[in-house]
């Protein structure tokens, strides 16, 4: 073994000893309530395909037509010759759906966060993030070079204290522009499933003259009128400067997006490096996402959304989303719990550090509209055995 591989092997061994080593599992089926892994079929309670659209005939037909007309790849970045019609159609559909002036799509939600935050902020600016925001937002905040402050999860008092500090430290210096203050939160948090107090955050951002960026990845398609998200449901979407999200969760496709003003989108086209220097996404995925947005605004889409909420309430009336965390704490015990569930043909992976903080390992249950009453009951019964 080379010195290089030997060093990495030692690091992997350390992860194993801490119960933190992960592995890829090959899935030999489409996403759905049942998936095939290692020749065995499991009930799947781990997918973000909340509305069961990833394998829906409507999306597959749209993707196939896009492949037939536009091929398998865009072949270049959007600013060269890769700005194919499906991307423009998707962005127009997204902007109309979110009731914003414009939208811009990225290859992933991660790329959307990195590109947007790093384009908007520099070393003289201030970024304030919720403690539990997605890793892409944390990484973007660090890469931007802006002064980073973190407020305790959904803690408005802590947020205001930081905003007071930021307000004092954002005054324009001689020859320099005023420092901007950007608050970033998720609307529905990816690992805990709880909701941000967006109305109150909007009040604070207006009070201190800050900008607000809201990641609606786990709310889009599920919450609000026609699934427009939590900001729309709470009546504050017009006061959110930057709406971010993904196309690979409830929408069943792939990619990330930013919705906002026309000026914002034009600025990102010129300054977001993850957009400028990436080959455009797959046109088939864009076409599928457009079909998904059109579907979720239809009567059948509303019925699908209502079915999801029926499944959530069947499991428990207290949850605010399709994400249900089963907190265990210890990493090794969490892995053992996931293994025990697989023995009952139920697939729920152990979520451990660095996805969540040390000592907060959990099983992250996700429910979808594709699950049946019987399957949710099977899940409930299986979870009871963990305490037996």
Q: For the regions a protein language model found, what residue spans apply to each?
A:
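Conserved PLP-anchoring active-site segment centered on the Schiff-base-forming lysine
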Residues: 116-135
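PLP-dependent aminotransferase class I/II
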Residues: 244-246, 250-319
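Conserved PLP-binding catalytic core of the aspartate aminotransferase-like
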Residues: 304-345, 355, 359-360, 367-369
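N-terminal "arm"/small-domain region of PLP-dependent enzymes with the aminotransferase-like
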Residues: 8-10, 14-70, 210
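Conserved N-terminal alpha-helix of the aminotransferase class I/II PLP-enzyme fold
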Residues: 61, 65-109
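Active-site phosphate-binding strand-loop segment of PLP-dependent enzymes
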Residues: 149, 153-214
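Conserved active-site segment immediately N-terminal to the catalytic lysine
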Residues: 209, 229-247, 266-270
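PLP-dependent enzyme catalytic core of the Aspartate aminotransferase-like
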Residues: 57, 61-65, 69, 96, ...
